[in-house]
Amino acid sequence: MSFPFTIGVVVIALMWIAGNVPNRTDVEWVKKGGGIVGDDHPPAYRFNAGQKMIYWIVVLGGGAIAASGYLLMFPFYVTNIAGMQLAQVVHGVVAVLFVAAMLGHIYIGTVGMEGAFEGMWDGTVDVNWAKQHHSLWAEKEIAKGQVSAPPPEGRMQAAE
């Protein structure tokens, strides 16, 4: 499972790096707790700060799991016994934190946020949902003509 896992992490890193570089909008998003603090959702582009955090957890955490896993798979090729012990601790701790983050991500993406599961299911989101949760992205797509003025039931292509 190590090689497919590593390939998956690399593919994810390459596919979505452009949209997941942190910016100033993300700082405001975090200050407002992603909309938990206050009455409205903070502005966000295609990926909000929470989604970017998950991306970096996958890329950096997955990279740490892969690197430490390879050290454990091929003992003593690169390191001594002390390095192997460190790799064991890093591998275990990062894997547990990774799984915890993914469980939180799965919850938010399914039952924790209305409309999120539908976006994953068919690749589109309701325009009104997009304007509420990713207002800067929705405005940009509407301005580009990707979506006409939003009817109440209108849908737009979700983040890929």
Language-model features: locations:
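Membrane-embedded alpha-helical bundles that constitute the cytochrome b-like, heme-associated redox core
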Residues: 1-160
